[in-house]
């Protein structure tokens, strides 16, 4: 399915990867949001389950392996073009995750990857909803529990 001017919304997943008091952020190298900071994530592939998509996207973009916990947020991300047509429309499901291995390095469709505190996230060029979900995740880190999303 093409990303721009889709026939229907595209399902995407995001990972709020938390390590202590910091969360992982990436700088997007492709549209939409090229040059902006975000959390690792992307589109699900056909036949791919949610948690598989999260693990794959984080590994592709950052080189890290993650354990997936619960859903943090679900929201629409709609980008109209100059004529008012819907150029991009995503339904995004963000999950709380923690790093389990690998070596942090930007790759795939990101130009940078780094760890930030909640305060630092607020000072980056980043959508307010992303800053909010990072702050929510950092407030929940003491309550991490295995994902209620089925593993099969």
Where are these regions (language model features)?
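A structural signal for short, well-ordered beta-strand segments
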Residues: 15, 71, 95-97
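A short coil-to-beta-strand element that immediately follows conserved catalytic motifs
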Residues: 65-74
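Conserved Nudix-box catalytic region and its N-terminal flanking loop in Nudix hydrolases
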Residues: 22-60
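Active-site-adjacent beta-strand/loop module that shapes the phosphate/pyrophosphate-binding cleft
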Residues: 76-103
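Charged phosphate-binding loop/patch that engages nucleotide di/tri-phosphates or the phosphate backbone
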Residues: 131-152
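Acidic, metal-coordinating catalytic segment for phosphate/diphosphate chemistry
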Residues: 1-14, 85
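NUDIX/MutT-family hydrolases
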Residues: 94, 105-137
């Amino acid at each position: 399915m093409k990303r721009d001017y889709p026939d229907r919304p595209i399902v995407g997943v995001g990972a709020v990867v938390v390590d202590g008091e910091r969360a992982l952020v990436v700088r997007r190298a492709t549209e939409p949001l090229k040059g902006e900071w975000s959390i690792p994530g992307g589109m699900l592939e056909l036949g791919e389950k949610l948690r598989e998509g999260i693990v794959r996207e984080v590994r592709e973009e950052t080189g890290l392996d993650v354990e997936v916990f619960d859903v943090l947020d679900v929201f629409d991300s709609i980008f109209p073009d100059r004529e008012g047509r819907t150029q991009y429309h995503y339904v995004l499901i963000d999950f709380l995750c923690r790093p389990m291995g690998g070596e942090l390095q930007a790759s795939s469709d990101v130009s940078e990857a780094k760890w930030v505190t909640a305060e630092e996230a607020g000072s980056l060029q980043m959508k307010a909803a992303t800053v909010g979900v990072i702050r929510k995740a950092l407030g929940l880190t003491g309550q991490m529990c295995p994902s209620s999303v089925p593993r099969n």
